Regions:
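Non-catalytic, mostly N-terminal accessory regions of nucleic-acid modification and defense proteins
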Residues: 1-178, 238-247, 346-349, 373-383, ...
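Conserved Class I SAM-dependent methyltransferase catalytic core
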Residues: 11-14, 18, 27-37, 237, ...
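Hydrophobic alpha-helical scaffolding
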Residues: 108, 131, 212-216, 259, ...
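Extended, highly charged linker/hinge segments and catalytic-adjacent loops that couple domains
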Residues: 259, 270, 276-278, 378, ...
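Glycine-rich phosphate-binding loops of NTPases
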Residues: 387-415
Length: 809
């Protein structure tokens, strides 16, 4: 059975985090990621004499498994890792974590149990098939773990990881495409764990030649392991200080590269350590020397010097580089004059693990620099600061945010409040200040109140006109909802529908019904074109989702009112939640995997990590792809209807009991003495009281309650038997499912129904926005000042009359 991506992720993280104890995540990651590496290379290469990695005798994960429970497990695990490291030139890479460190891993039995359980987590994973279909499950799992470790590590220790969403943006805006050759070079001077380099390399069909330098020893090891896990075994990753001792040089010059990406440490205060910028042997600071206590521009200047004359780079830096003065202003002015800066993308705040401050992407393009230097071309700016989702205590870019940024930047689209081309003259007029809000107004217009409408009543026509995008699609709906008032000045309308009925009126309007139907047409056409029934073993899920998601995006290009990126996000969310697991399973094991049920086995004393779908004779089962509800809906709807009726009957009886107890169970009620110690009523407590009762009314009440209890017990018994009968029928139905039935259940009943339902929800959300705005306007101006004054006067007269009647006025 194929491993589900989400199963790998959740199992690894939950289990590893459980074993972490009090250890800092920044330290524990070294143990977990080393173990993942050992498991992968052992599964992948132990029987491959010509593989990229040699697995020596006594140096495999299998040897670790044999150590579970061994009193010397820590020392022996270190020796196993050392053998693999020695055989592959990986000393100082995979042997960084000390598995015999009792201070971190505990002593005695605690140490043995912790390592034995850690090995046991990975023992259950078969990673031999990773990348066999061109999809990097393991690399993605590695990145998933790093994301979580970065989140847990806190502000000072999470800088080794650039969020994959940001990496994807950089990879897609520097010009790597299907025509980029394998010998094209990509370089990251502050490569961290290497995820940014790998994202760029993945954009080329055959990969790129990778170079990276990283100052931190443990992080360099992470990067080297990451390269191997992603199949980039030829990557050249070097440990060292890029600014003071750049490793990649040719003669007395810096080596130059086709592409450069980087997320260097923000505002490094020690960037001059080991370096005299005034006499830099590589002439990196020709355009100016950055401030001694702020190294942002030091990295940018190093990148520019390291680019070929046709090279393109993208670097993540804090927003301050766009507008800070003094030395940085001088450097910025020189870079603009040289035309090096092609564009700037402003990102949301709090995306990165090392800092919460907002950052930007500066894109350097030497190939087109001359036209910008002459003023023939401008500098393209994007303000993407408002497109994100909350993810715990961080912000995170969604798939739609990434796609929009990339689309807009690569096509240089001018979108109001989001992006525009800024000419050199305008930048000069702003004294070379590149602060994005100077050029793009992304603020939301304040909702203005109309004083005349508050005084005289009516909804301002200007407010109704502001909904013009709706009226273009629903012109007659406007006439249905509003009519013009004829008081002074005109320009005001009244709402013809009660405030509480506005949404219903919109939904029932013929134009809306037509709009809703037409909004589903692109989806229906797209669905027919996806040909998901043609998925076969060996297909590449990542290629599939790329193809169908791009097609869906294109089909909603001109759909009125709907945002094509919102529709795209619906598909990508469902892909992450469920669809990718289904497709991965089918691509590895075929459609028949849909008929499989997996028995859930849990060790004694442990809890189930998954909720069972079926329980048959006390044995718990998990459906791999098709939940029982889908089989029930298609094949056992009558039986389910019967169960629903039985449940309703039981609910009625239970409600009757609750009402009866509420009526007679208070302190002076007939059932007052029938409650148990906890104050509740059950068959035992009522029978006990019945033996002592002498009052005929009390006896009758007790017997009535017992009769209700009997009815409830019988109803529960009948319901339980019916449910067990249905569960057994469904259980027996799974093995009878043929490929055609599985495809129908998955494609139509699960995938199509879910996606269509969510798009219908999006259509309704758009409608709700219109209805809510109209309701807001109607209620805002419902009581003009004159009406309020009249009401106050009327109430005053009533009070005066009452006072007179009382003789006090």
């Amino acid at each position: 059975m194929a491993l589900k991506k989400t199963e790998i992720y959740s199992t690894l993280w939950a289990s590893c985090n459980e074993l972490r104890g009090g250890m800092d995540a920044s330290q524990y990651k070294d143990y977990v990621l080393t173990m993942l590496f050992m498991k992968y290379v052992s599964d992948k290469y132990k029987d491959d004499a010509f593989g990229d990695i040699v697995v020596p005798e006594g140096g495999s994960f299998d040897d670790m498994v044999a150590l579970k429970g061994d009193k010397e497990i820590g020392e022996k695990v270190d020796k196993i890792i050392a053998k693999l490291a020695e055989a592959n030139g990986l000393r100082g890479v995979i042997d960084v974590a000390d598995f015999n460190d009792e201070e971190k891993l505990g002593t005695g039995k605690e140490h043995v149990d912790r390592l034995s359980k850690l090995i046991g987590i990975f023992e259950g994973l078969d990673l031999s098939g990773n990348r066999a279909d061109g999809d990097d499950l393991l690399g993605d799992a590695y990145e998933y773990l790093m994301r979580h470790f970065a989140t847990e590590s806190g502000k000072s220790k999470g800088q080794f990881y650039t969020p994959s969403e940001v990496s994807r943006i950089l990879a897609k805006i520097i010009g790597v495409d299907d025509n980029t050759p394998l010998d094209a070079t990509v370089y990251d001077p502050a490569c961290g764990s290497g995820s940014l380099l790998l994202k760029v390399s993945d954009e080329a069909p055959r990969g790129l030649t990778i170079y990276g330098q990283e100052m931190d020893f443990a992080t360099t090891a992470l990067a080297k392991m990451n390269m191997i896990l992603h199949g980039a075994t030829g990557a050249d990753i070097y440990k060292g200080n890029t600014l003071s001792s750049p490793h990649f040089v040719e003669g007395n010059q810096l080596k130059t590269f086709d592409f450069i990406v980087a997320n260097p440490p923000f505002s490094n205060k020690n960037w001059t350590s080991g370096l005299n910028p005034e006499s830099d042997e590589f002439d990196r600071f020709t355009w100016g020397i950055p401030p001694e206590k702020n190294g942002d521009y030091a990295f940018l200047l190093h990148i520019i010097k390291s680019l070929k004359s046709t090279g393109v780079g993208a670097v993540i830096l804090p927003h301050g580089v766009l507008f800070r003065g003094n030395a940085e202003a001088h450097i910025r002015q020189n870079l603009i004059k040289q035309g090096y800066i092609k564009g700037i993308i402003g990102l949301p705040a709090n995306l990165f693990y090392g800092t919460g401050i907002p950052a930007c992407v500066i894109v350097i393009d030497k190939n087109t620099a001359q036209s910008r230097a002459k003023g023939d071309a401008g500098l393209f700016m994007v303000d993407a600061s408002r497109g994100y989702m909350k993810d715990g205590n961080k912000n995170r870019l969604r798939s739609q945010d990434i796609h929009k940024i990339v689309d807009v930047f690569n096509s240089q689209l001018n979108l109001t409040g989001y992006s525009r081309m800024v000419e050199l003259d305008e930048i000069i007029d702003n004294d070379y200040n590149l602060n994005i809000p100077r050029y793009i107004d992304a603020s939301i217009d304040e909702d203005q109140h109309d004083l005349t409408a508050h005084l005289k009543g009516g909804i301002p026509v200007a407010d109704i006109d502001s909904l013009e995008s709706y009226w273009q699609v629903l012109p007659n709906l406007r006439k249905t909802l509003f009519s013009e008032l004829k008081h002074s000045g005109n320009g005001y309308c009244e709402c013809l529908v009660a405030s509480t009925e506005i949404k219903a009126a919109v939904l029932a309007h013929p134009e809306f019904i037509t709009f809703a139907e037409q909004s589903l047409t692109p989806f229906n056409d797209w669905w027919q074109a996806t040909q998901l029934s043609e998925i076969t073993k060996g297909d590449r899920p990542k290629a599939l989702i790329h193809k169908i998601s791009e097609d869906l995006l294109q089909r909603y290009e001109i759909a009125p009112l709907l945002d094509k990126y919102d529709i795209y996000q619906i598909l990508m969310d469902y892909w992450s939640e469920s669809l990718q697991d289904d497709v991965y399973a089918i691509s590895q094991d075929g459609w028949q995997v849909g008929a499989q049920l997996r028995k859930l086995v849990v060790a004694k004393g442990e809890k189930l990590k998954e909720e069972p779908d079926l329980i048959i004779n006390k044995v718990k089962y998990k459906a791999e792809l098709i939940p029982p509800a889908l089989i029930i809906d298609r094949y056992y709807s009558d039986e389910q209807a019967h169960i629903d009726a039985l449940q309703a009957e039981l609910d009625t009886i239970s409600s009757t009991i609750a009402d009866y107890v509420e009526e007679h169970g208070d302190e002076e009620g007939l059932l007052a003495d029938a409650a148990n110690e906890k104050g509740s009523f059950n068959k035992s407590s009522v029978n006990a009281r019945l033996k002592l009762a002498t009052d005929s009314d009390e006896i009758e009440a007790l017997k009535q309650l017992l009769a209700y209890f009997e009815l409830e017990a019988n109803a529960k018994k009948v319901l339980k038997e019916a449910q067990e009968t249905l569960d057994l029928a469904v259980f027996k139905h799974y093995p009878t499912l043929d490929e055609a039935a599985i495809k129908t259940l998955l494609i139509e009943d699960k995938w199509h129904a879910t996606l269509q339902g969510r798009i219908e929800d999006e259509i309704e959300r758009i409608t709700a926005q219109l209805a809510n705005r109209i309701k807001e306007l109607d209620e805002r101006y419902a009581e003009p000042l004159s009406q309020i004054v009249d009401e106050v006067e009327m109430l005053g007269q009533k009070v005066q009359a009452h006072l007179q009647a009382m003789g006090v006025a």
